[in-house]
Swiss-Prot record:
Keyword Ubl conjugation tagged: no
GO CC terms, sorted: cytoplasm
Main localization, broad class: cytoplasm
UniProt cross-references to HAMAP family, sorted A to Z: Anti_adapt_IraM
GO biological process, one term: cellular response to starvation
Function of the molecule: Involved in the stabilization of the sigma stress factor RpoS.
Recorded family membership: Belongs to the IraM/RssC family.
Name of the protein in its database record: Anti-adapter protein IraM
InterPro entries membership: Anti-adapter_IraM, PmrD_sf
Organism whose genome encodes this protein: Klebsiella pneumoniae (strain 342)
Cellular localisation: Cytoplasm
Gene: iraM
Keyword Cell membrane: no
UniProt KW keywords: Cytoplasm, Stress response
């Protein structure tokens, strides 16, 4: 089944991401996962038994939980300390998590060890 990414929240301390996903049948879920990629809004994916096809490339994805989408739960996740990416951060903003960020691929494409200015 094909899923579309609606939104993604990232926890820099744990490296776990939370994505709101939707199917063609308008089913909506919140997926908690860890991966070598961050699912960005508008991207699509197809789940298979051992891997995930994301934008026509296979990736490993460790899924911790999938729950039915609930707006109140999503808002609670948004209130947690999170990556500046969620707040629409720009390169001129500062990233307080850079020194200990556990995210494998920065959604702002900042190389490891390079301070965010």
């Amino acid at each position: 089944m094909k899923w579309t990414i609606l939104n993604t929240l990232i926890c820099p301390q744990s490296g776990i991401a939370f994505s709101a996903i939707s199917s063609l049948r308008f089913l909506k879920f919140i997926m908690w996962y860890e991966a070598d990629v961050i699912l960005l809004p508008g991207e699509s994916m197809k789940l298979y038994s051992s891997r995930v096809l994301i934008n026509d490339q296979y990736h490993s994805l460790k899924i911790y939980n999938i729950t039915v989408y609930d707006e109140a739960q999503w808002e609670k996740l948004r209130e947690r300390p999170s990556c500046p990416y969620q707040a629409g951060g720009k390169q001129s903003d500062s990233c307080f998590f850079q020194s200990f960020c556990a995210i494998k691929r920065c959604p702002n494409n900042i190389p490891r060890g390079e301070p965010w200015r």
